[in-house]
Amino acid sequence: MDVVFALGGSVLMPKEGASTENIQNYAKAFKKLKEMGHRVSVVVGGGNTARQYISVAREFTNESFCDEIGILATRMNSMLLISALGKDAVKQVPENFKDAELILNMDKILVMGGTHPAHTTDAVSATLAEFIDADLLVIATNVDGVYTKDPRCNEDAVKLDKINTKELLEITGSSSMSAGSSGVVDPLASKIIDRAELKTIVVKGIPEEILASVSGDHNGTTITP
């Protein structure tokens, strides 16, 4: 199976900072999937690293330049995961999809970050999945699925086990995005998922759920065309 993962930067690099064990556990999960015969691509978010830099930069500059800072943060996080993957990855963070596909064709795990200003890594992962005709897109984030509202600030939020892409558009359509902002699935990614008719799974961004998302035994939300 050809699988693209959107790995939230905040799960790889939590607020307390880098953890060798944490990064190694993610690397082990992706290596295991490769050993099982899957073709694995990982798009890593900027997370807290990006938000810290952007919060300072925003005092001096515009959103477009803040986007560029965020992109660099995603690539730094990507390099950490690449280093943990060792020989299963290439020590290069591609900046476009053609270079990304070359790495996949070398039978390596692809790891990349952001590509364009105003595009979140969710949107990048969805576009990559469309570009390479992936079988599955997995969004591994700090929430365990798609809810009717943000569960982090709404006690009455209801988790949705299965929805279609049109319903996803309705849920995410009112969201606004700026450099460094985070959400379970951002509006642009939702539009790409719908356009490409991508089967998508949203799970809690832990190694166990990453593995389970491919086997189908996960606890997240399945999004179908």
UniProtKB/Swiss-Prot annotation:
A Pfam family the protein falls into? AA_kinase
Regulation acting on activity, per entry? Inhibited by UTP.
Name the enzyme's class: transferase
Q: What is its pathway?
A: Pyrimidine metabolism; CTP biosynthesis via de novo pathway; UDP from UMP (UMPK route): step 1/1
Q: Which reaction does it catalyse?
A: UMP + ATP = UDP + ADP
**Is Mitochondrion set as a keyword in this record?**
no
- Gene3D superfamilies xrefs: Acetylglutamate kinase-like
Q: Name one GO cellular component term.
A: cytoplasm
Cellular localization per UniProt:
Cytoplasm
Role of this protein? Catalyzes the reversible phosphorylation of UMP to UDP.
Q: Which family does it belong to?
A: Belongs to the UMP kinase family.
This chain belongs to the protein called Uridylate kinase
